Amino acid sequence: MIYQPLDPLLHAELRLAVMSLLISNLEAEFPYIKEQTGATAGNLSVQIDKLSSAGYIKVKKTFKGKRPCTICRITSKGQKAFEAYVQALKSYLDVKIEN
């Protein structure tokens, strides 16, 4: 059996969690992602920057009243990368054990 390579950008736990949230929600605000992942604000910011630099997500900075609001949205490139990652992961899980 040939295993498909796993995207190292998505293989990191926090980045995978962010992408999983965005796959099901399409977009989410920073505090929601932070709450759902249990990440620190600093670490989450770094990981979001990496996903954004790769073109997997778009980051929009706006204001809600006078407060800053960061919104993350998955891109079509990010959706395709996530789907490819899931398919590659399945190649590792689809192992038949013979006795």
Language-model-derived ranges and their functions:
Residues I48-L51:
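Basic amphipathic alpha-helical segments that dock to polyanions
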Residues I74-G78:
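Accessory beta->alpha helical hairpin/"wing" motif in late/C-terminal subdomains of nucleic-acid enzymes
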Residues I2-T40, T62-K64, I71-R73:
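N-terminal helix-turn-helix DNA-binding core of bacterial DNA-binding proteins
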Residues V59:
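Short beta-strand "wing" residues that participate in macromolecule-binding interfaces
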Residues M1-Y3, S20, Q79-N99:
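Amphipathic alpha-helical dimerization/coiled-coil segments
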Residues G55:
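Glycine-centered, phosphate/nucleic-acid-interacting loop/turn motifs that mediate DNA/RNA or nucleotide
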